[in-house]
Amino acid sequence: MTNEQLQRKHQSLATLITRIIFLVLGLITIGIFIQSYYFSNKIIKQEVMLTKQQTSALVKSLFNNHLSILQIHHDSNSKNEAIRRFFLDGDDEKLEYYFLSMDQADPTHTPEFRFLTTGEGLLWDDGNAHFYGVNEVLLEKISQSVLFGNNWHFMSLHTLMGLRNMLVRRSPVIDTTTGEVLGQYYISVVLDNNFPLVEMLESGSNSDNIVMLVGDKVISHSLSGNEPYDLDSLLAMRDEPSAFDDCLISQTPIEINSTDTLVSILAIQENSHVASLQRQHYLGLATSVVLMLMLSLAIRSWIQNRVANALESLMAYSRFAGTGEKYERFNGSDILEFAHIGHTLENTFEQLESQRRSFQDLFNFALSPMMVWSESGLLIQMNPAAMKELGIEHASPQDFSNPLFQLFKLKLSPHLKMAAQGATLTGINVPIGEKIFRWNLSPIVVENGISGIIVQGQDITTLIDAEKQSNLARREAEQSAKTRADFLAKMSHEIRTPLNGILGIAQLLKRSVNDAENLKQVDVLCNSGEHLLAVLNDILDFSKIEQGKFNIKKRDFNFYDTLNTLENIYRPICREKGVSFEIHNQIPLDCQLHTDQVRLNQIMFNLISNAVKFTPAGRIEVSFKLEKFARSEHSILSIQVSDTGIGIDESKLESIFEPFVQADSLSTREYGGSGLGLTIVKNLVEMLEGEISVQSELCKGSTFYLSIPVEKGECEEQKTPTNPKPEQLFGQGLKVLLVEDNHTNAFILKAFCQKYQMSVEWVQDGTQALEKLKEHAFDLILMDNQLPKMGGIEATREIRETLKLGTPIYACTADAQESTKQEFLSAGANRVIVKPIKEQELHDELLHFKAHYWVEH
C-alpha cells in the first residue's frame, strides 16, 4: 500500500491531535460554563439562605430577649414589698401605684395585663384584661391552666372579643419572714394585634415588614398597604420560596420552653441586591465564553504548525528502523514526547539483546537447579547446577537415560501435568538421590497459551533433618512432662494418704486431750502436718502453672465472703502467735465482684501466710480498695499486705518471685517453706491480668502491692451465715456408705461422721459397695478413688448407669490432679474432696450436702 493510499485511508496524527484538543477545549468551556452557572446559583442560594438564617436567628433572639426581660421584671416584682403587703393588708392603691411606676419606667417591656391569685381564687387584676375580652372567669381559667412551674405557657383562649393567642407566666409571692407562699402573680403577653412587639421586631431585625402567624392565620403585622405585595402573596411565597424573588421572606418558628408552638414570625426584606448579582453573573459567563473560543482557535493554529513537522521527522525514523537496515541513532526532536519515543526505539534492540544475555547468565550461574520443560513433559534445557545434582555431564541422550534422572522425571511428571494446565505449584518435595529438594513449578504463558514450564529447586535436606530432630525433641519433652506429672500425682496420693491419717488423728486427739503439755504436742503434730500439706500443694500448683493447666474461672461473688474467710482463719492464728491482725476495707460489704474468687483467695492465703510466718512479733495489716478509672470498663481492686516481720534484703527483691527462692538460707532453716508461694502468687496475679510489687526493708517488714482488674456487679444485701453445731445439722441420723480401703482413713472418717449422729457402714472396695447398695438404701456415699478389685471412678459409673441410683456421691481422693476430679464428675460424682480431709472442710461439705441434696424423711 502506497503513502498516498495511507493518507487517503487514515488521518494525520497532527490533524487528529488538533481536532481532539479543539474538542476538549470546547467541552471544557461548556463544562466551565455549566459548573460556573451551577456554583454561582448555589452560592447565591446559600447567601440567601444564610441571610434568612441570620434574620431568623435575630428575630428569635429579639423575641426571646423580650420574654426574658419580662421574666426578669416578673420575678423581681413578685419579691417586691408592695405586692407582699397587698396579700397581707389588701392595700390595692399602693399596688396599682407600684405597677404604674414600673410601666412608666420601661414601657417597652410591659405585659398586656396582670392579675394576682390565692389558693381561693382570683384576688386582684389590673383591669387591662377587659380590653382583650378576658373577664374574671377567663382569668380563673388561665390560672387553672398554668398550675405548675414558672415558665412561659402559650395558649389560645376564646374570649368575649374572639380567639386570643397569648403567653402567660406565673411567679410565686413568698413571705420573706415565714417562707409562706402568699399567692401567685400572673402576667400575660397578648400576641394578637400586638403592634409594639411587631415594630420592635421590625426595627431590631432590620426588616421591611413583620408578620406574626399562629399556624396559617395572621394575628399581627406591620404592613401599611403601600407595599407591592399583600398578606396572601407573602404566604404563597413563603410556601414556595425562590432565591430570586423580589423580596426575601424568613420564617422563624417560636419555641416556648424548648417546645415547638404554632406561633411563627415572617420577616420580609428587600431582595434587589440578589437580582443585581445575578445579572453580573450572566454577563461574566458570556465574556468567559468569548475569550475561551478565541483562545481555542489560537491554540489550534499553533499546535497544527508545531506538531506536524516533529511528527513527520519521527515517522521517517520509524519507517527507516522498520526496514531492518543498519542501526542508526535518532536525531532528536524539540518535543519531549517525540524525542522520548525516538530514543526508546533506538534502545529497544540493544536492551532486548542485553536482557537475553542477562537471563542466560542467571540461568547458567544459578547455584540452585533450574530446568525448562515443555507442556508435553519433555526436558528443553537445564542449568549446570541441575546437571550436577542429576549426574549429567553432557546433554546427550545417554546421560538422560541414567536411572537417577529417570526416577526424578517419574516423580516430577504428575506435577508437570498440573503445571501444563496453568497451575502454579510451590513447595513440592521431590528427592534426587539422597537429597531432598523443594521445587516450584511455574507455567510460561504466551498469548493465552502455555509455551513451557520453569522448574526451580532448593536443597532442603538439612531443614528436613532439623525438623525431624525438633519433632523428636518435642515428643521427648512431652513424654518427660507426662512422666513428671504422673510422678507428682503418684507422690501426691502416696503422701496425702498417710497425711490424712496424721491430721485426722491429730484433730481427734485435740478434742480428747486435756493435759496442756499433751495438747501442745498435738498442736506440734497438727502444725507439722499442715506445713507438709502446704508444701505439697505449692509443688502441685507450681507444676500445674508450668504445664499451663491452671484455669481461670471468673464469676460473680460477694466480697464479704473473702473478708469473712480471712478474718476467721488468720485472726485466731495471729492471736495465738501474739501478732496484731487488722483488715482495713474501703469496699462496701454487700459489693459483688466479678473475677476468679478461688484464685483471689489463694493469692491472699499465700501472702498472709507468709506474713504470719515471717512476723514473730508486731502487726499484720491488710487493706482493700476499689478504684474506677474513666474510659475503662473495669475497676481496679487494690490490695496491700503489710507486716513488721524480718523483711527482705534489697538485693533479694528482684529475685524474690522466682521459684525456690527465699530471702536467705537462714530464713529457710528457721521458718521453713518450699520457696514457691510468691512464685505462685505472681503467676496467679498475671493470669488475672494484674500486677504485683513489693517494698521491704531488712528487720523492719515488707509490703506487697497488688492491682487486679475486676468488674463490679450489683450490690445485694449481706446475709449472715449460720453455722449449726454438728449434732444439730441433721434432724435425724444419716445412713452413710463409706467406701475406703485404708483402715486409718476409714477410722478417721467414721469418727468425724459420728459427731453428726450418722450411721456409717464401711466397705473396702467398689464391688462390696455395689452389693451393699443393692440390699440397702443410703442417704450419702463417701467414695475413695484407688480401691482393690474395682476403683472408685468405675464404681461411681456402675452406680449411676447399672444400678440407676441417684444417691449423692462425694468422692474422697488423695489425687489432687484436675484430670482425676473431672473423671469422677463425668462418672456421676456430685462433689470431689481432696485428702487430707480436715474436720472443718468435712463440715462445709456436709452443709453443701444439706443445702442441695438432703430431704428430711
Swiss-Prot record:
It catalyses: ATP + protein L-histidine = ADP + protein N-phospho-L-histidine. It is a multi-pass membrane protein. InterPro entries: AI-2_sensor_kinase/phosphatase, CheY-like_superfamily, HATPase_C_sf, His_kinase_dom, HisK_dim/P_dom, HisK_dim/P_sf, LuxQ-periplasm_dom, LuxQ-periplasm_N. The modification Phosphohistidine is found at residue 493. Its EC number is 2.7.13.3, 3.1.3.-. It is found in: Cell inner membrane. The modification 4-aspartylphosphate is found at residue 784. SMART domains: HATPase_c, HisKA, REC. One of its GO terms (molecular function) is phosphorelay sensor kinase activity. The chain crosses the membrane at residues 20-40, 283-303. At low cell density, in absence of autoinducer has a kinase activity, and autophosphorylates on a histidine residue. The phosphoryl group is then transferred to an aspartate residue in the response regulator domain. The phosphoryl group is transferred to LuxU, and ultimately to LuxO. At high cell density, in the presence of autoinducer, the kinase activity is inactivated, and the response regulator domain has a phosphatase activity. Binds the complex formed by the autoinducer and LuxP. This is Autoinducer 2 sensor kinase/phosphatase LuxQ. It comes from Vibrio vulnificus (strain CMCP6).
